């Protein structure tokens, strides 16, 4: 490489004149005189002052043999992290959801059975001796197999699993630990002689050290099954006694957008160590599918959901639970990177062309949303509301203004699987859905108040016809839907609960205004009697005795049998995860019904009538 051409000295201020046309050559190496480096080209004084900066190292490689300096860096310092563009596709079988792929960054981990599993359930971590594969989130894992991973296959557990050197500082010793280092016994066991050992510093007393915490410990428990730990089912009175003290208690486990995470299992067992009930408060995305959340709470923790009100779940540990022999799982030291999943929004969704999808998206811009979701709200009825909205329209939009983008995308993915529906757009913080071409109504034929009437009976209709043509007499008027399916369901529930009266065709044809008024008055009395039948405290006067009232109450077979059947059904309910079971308020449940004429107001009326 020829030396650079000489340059003229650059102009400088007074007192700072550049006396050299180029930078002075570096000094020769006294130890290795042959190792000389060529001078670097001069740098403009405007950009860099040579007096304030040191010379750059030599770029010439040594020609003679000499001591070489090898740079060894740990792979953890150049490992991929959240800001690196790491992407590794998973095997085709795992991406198609047909099997699992085992990945391991360290050969020793693969030989010991420690591996990262990529399969239909997402990204999980397998450890030897574990009862199940660990995941970061058990309830919010997508139901689609991942396409690629965003970080190397490292296990997010104990420090020995990651090749990272110790670069921190040892914690300060406490007074007790310093005493242990000096060999001073803090207490002497009764009835035992202290063993002594001789060392270079004199007589040192053996002291039992503190047990070290094993972050990678995996213990499935004492081998008992979940049914053996739970024991016999709880009676309604026991459930009431367990749940009531925790209703207004603030000692609870909060579940947010990530759902039931792995480290929450340890927190649940910490709650169970001091109390039999663990109160779980759910907000946000997991409340869309509370059945799924309750299922994973029971399966992963081993407990039993005995009561649920809205987004609050009460988890029971079991009759034979022992904190000393409980299962122990390692803690995740960091949140693993989320894998790459298929896109939720497609240009041409399943069953539609691109032109049809674009047309539906244009219609959805002017569509009014059926509801607006609040941040960290409770969305228990969202699936039902979307299903009811699809009964009247093929497009449904939900307003998610103010929510995190990842939140309403997770909500859309849940609605796609639970409703089911076809996702069209997430634009403008709105979830736009279509009910799909294979949609079928959940209700029977809608109820109508106008029966089929032959057109020949409607003279006014034929006269008012603009075409002045009378159609065939056998043709009938098309049915006009007076009640929508949702309103029909409300009417049906009102009739079943004796809050509404349904008349057949014969009664409706013979109905007159006077008879209608009489019928309404009779029904109002009956509905009030049904509505106001509730347990009350029986207060009797001196004439009537409590024995006669209790005997009359016990002899009332129909009402007591109905109440007994209702209580038996609640006790023998096999599936406590059903929403209908949890909607029952167990603290205001009707345990019995009072016979007619036994209320205090009835005794007062009888006394006034006799006077």
Swiss-Prot record:
Residues 55-72 have a biased composition (Polar residues). Its main location: plastid. GO terms for biological process: Group II intron splicing; mRNA processing. Residues 232-328, 350-446 form the CRM domain. The keyword Ribonucleoprotein applies. Signal peptide: none annotated. Residues 486-509 are annotated as: CRS2 binding. InterPro entries: CAF1P_plant (IPR044599), RNA-binding_CRM (IPR001890), YhbY-like_sf (IPR035920). One of its GO terms (cellular component) is chloroplast stroma. GO terms for molecular function: RNA binding. It holds the Pfam family CRS1_YhbY. Keywords: Chloroplast, mRNA processing, mRNA splicing, Plastid, Repeat, Ribonucleoprotein, RNA-binding, Transit peptide. It is found in: Plastid, Chloroplast stroma. PANTHER family: CRS2-ASSOCIATED FACTOR 1, CHLOROPLASTIC (PTHR46247), CRS2-ASSOCIATED FACTOR 2, CHLOROPLASTIC (PTHR46247:SF3). Required for the splicing of group IIB introns in chloroplasts. Forms splicing particles with CRS2. Interacts with RNA and confers intron specificity of the splicing particles. This is CRS2-associated factor 2, chloroplastic.
């Amino acid at each position: 490489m020829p030396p650079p051409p000489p340059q003229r000295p650059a102009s400088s201020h007074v007192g700072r004149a550049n006396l050299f046309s180029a930078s002075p050559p570096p000094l020769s190496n006294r130890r290795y005189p042959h190792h000389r480096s060529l001078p670097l080209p001069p740098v403009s004084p405007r950009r860099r002052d040579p007096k304030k900066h040191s010379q750059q190292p030599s770029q010439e490689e040594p020609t003679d043999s000499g001591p070489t300096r090898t740079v060894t860096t740990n792979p953890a310092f150049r490992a991929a992290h959240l800001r690196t563009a790491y992407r590794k596709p998973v095997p085709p079988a795992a991406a198609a959801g047909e099997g699992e792929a085992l990945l391991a960054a360290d050969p020793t981990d693969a030989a010991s059975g420690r591996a990262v599993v990529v399969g239909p359930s997402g990204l999980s971590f397998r450890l030897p001796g574990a009862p199940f594969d660990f995941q970061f989130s058990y309830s919010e894992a997508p139901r689609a197999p991942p396409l690629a991973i965003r970080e190397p296959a490292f296990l997010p557990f104990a420090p020995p699993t990651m090749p990272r050197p110790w670069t921190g500082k040892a914690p300060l010793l406490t007074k007790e630990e310093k005493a242990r280092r000096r060999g001073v016994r803090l207490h002497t066991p009764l009835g035992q002689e202290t063993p002594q050992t001789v060392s270079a510093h004199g007589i040192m007393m053996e002291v039992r050290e503190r047990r070290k915490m094993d972050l990678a410990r995996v213990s499935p428990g004492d081998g008992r099954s979940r049914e053996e730990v739970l024991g016999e089912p709880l009676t309604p009175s026991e459930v009431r006694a367990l749940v009531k003290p925790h209703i207004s208690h603030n000692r609870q486990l909060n579940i947010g957008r990530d759902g039931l995470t792995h480290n929450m299992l340890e927190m649940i067992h910490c709650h169970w160590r001091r109390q039999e009930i663990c109160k779980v408060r759910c907000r946000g995305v997991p409340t869309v599918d509370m059945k799924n959340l309750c299922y994973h709470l029971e399966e992963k923790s081993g407990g039993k959901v005995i009561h649920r009100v809205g987004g609050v779940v009460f988890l029971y540990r079991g009759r034979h639970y022992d904190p000393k022999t409980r299962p122990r799982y390692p803690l995740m030291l960091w949140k693993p990177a989320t894998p790459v999943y298929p896109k939720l929004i497609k240009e041409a969704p399943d069953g539609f062309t691109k032109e049809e999808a674009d047309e539906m998206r244009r219609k959805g811009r002017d569509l009014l949303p059926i509801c607006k979701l609040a941040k960290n709200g409770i969305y228990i009825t969202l699936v039902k509301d979307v299903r009811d909205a699809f009964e009247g329209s093929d497009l449904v939009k939900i307003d998610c203004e103010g929510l995190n983008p990842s939140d309403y995308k997770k909500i859309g993915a849940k609605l796609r699987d639970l409703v089911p529906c076809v996702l069209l757009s997430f634009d403008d913080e709105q979830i736009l859905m279509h009910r799909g071409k294979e949609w079928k109504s959940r209700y029977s034929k809608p109820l109508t108040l106008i029966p089929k009437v032959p057109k020949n009976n409607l003279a006014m209709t034929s006269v008012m016809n603009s075409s002045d043509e009378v159609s065939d007499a056998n043709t009938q008027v098309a049915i006009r839907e007076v009640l929508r399916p949702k309103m029909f369901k409300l009417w049906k529930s009102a009739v079943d609960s004796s809050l509404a009266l349904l008349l057949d065709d014969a009664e409706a044809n013979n109905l007159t205004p006077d008879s209608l008024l009489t019928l309404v008055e009779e029904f109002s009395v009956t509905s009030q009697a049904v509505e106001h039948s509730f347990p009350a405290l029986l207060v009797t006067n001196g004439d009537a005795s409590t024995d006669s009232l209790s005997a009359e109450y016990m002899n009332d077979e129909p009402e007591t049998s109905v109440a007994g059947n209702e209580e038996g059904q609640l006790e023998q309910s096999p599936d406590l995860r059903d929403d209908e079971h949890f909607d029952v308020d167990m603290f205001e449940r009707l345990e019995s019904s009072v016979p007619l004429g036994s209320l205090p107001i009835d005794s007062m009326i009888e006394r006034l009538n006799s006077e």
